[in-house]
């Protein structure tokens, strides 16, 4: 998916990152329409792009594969009715609180990230932002992306962020005991 006038692209993950030139069968069918925010030329000659996800999509059909993959997609729209439910609100609140705890307890994450998390107003943006920045396998991130609805995505995000927080606490506890010995 590409729209040159709006600098948007379709982003999908590969099932196996070792495949150099993936075919349509080597890609997950769920992806994200993303806006290109910045294109960076790296010192090693490679190019990196900074993107912001806008909405989810599902690949329906291959249109062409040269010079790049071109596909027909179906946009996946959020059901905003769920966002008003109290369980959903509490789940989002828990995600935000746990993300802030991880930031505060992990010396490798800049403290400004806590400010950024606290100031995200959109529930779906928070869930997507936290999910994309967690240290998860591509397969686990794909599970979150492929969830049927925003409530299910929020619960999966909370499950994974709680596991990440438990690992961080255990790691910090081990390092503290080693220092004290």
Predicted segments with their positions:
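N-terminal low-complexity, acidic/polar interaction/targeting segments
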Residues: 1-181
